[in-house]
Amino acid sequence: VIGMICAGTLAALGAQIGLKGPITSHPSVKDQLDALYEYKDSPVVVSDNFVTSRGPGTTFLFALTLVEKLVGLEKRNEISGPMMLV
């Protein structure tokens, strides 16, 4: 599983990870990714084992998505329930 958040998604571009696939990032770097990716304005974007997220405000959703990818939906639900995320 590869996870990138905020402007860190520029590393995907440099490493040519997931080219032409869906991706998200901090809006400040969107223009740098737009031509080579299917850019989404979603808080978290999952493409196979590549997970990207927008920034500090999306970190809980990003982390829970990584938990789900690594150990399953049941564990994600177990963790997220007590957190009372909206």
Where are these regions (language model features)?
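Active-site-adjacent pocket-lining segments in enzyme domains
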Residues: 1-86
